[in-house]
Amino acid sequence: MPSNCEILCEIIIAILLPPLGVCFRKGCCTVEFLICLVLTILGYVPGIIYAIYVIVFQHREEYFDEYRRPIYSA
């Protein structure tokens, strides 16, 4: 699980170069990276929005999984 500092650094990188931020999180040969690359070429702001979405909101259940477990098992 990445720390808050790592997520913040990825967001800053995603604002400067959106495909690079997605590449750090998902890899360079993924569909998410290609979508971000196309969105950045078509318009810089949509690329930023998508990169932040990928970094922050995808697979967020991994971060909150420990809070969903029951305290007592029956």
From Swiss-Prot:
Coiled-coil stretches: none
UniProt cross-references to InterPro entries, sorted A to Z: PMP3
TM helices/strands, residue ranges: 4-24, 37-57
Signal peptide residues on this chain, from the entry's feature table: none
GO cellular component, one term: membrane
Keyword Membrane appears in the UniProt entry: yes
Top-level taxon: Eukaryota
Compartmental location: Membrane
Alphabetical UniProt keywords: Membrane, Transmembrane, Transmembrane helix
Its membrane topology: Multi-pass membrane protein
Pfam families: Pmp3
Family to which this protein belongs: Belongs to the UPF0057 (PMP3) family.
Protein name as it appears in the record: UPF0057 membrane protein At4g30660
Organism name: Arabidopsis thaliana
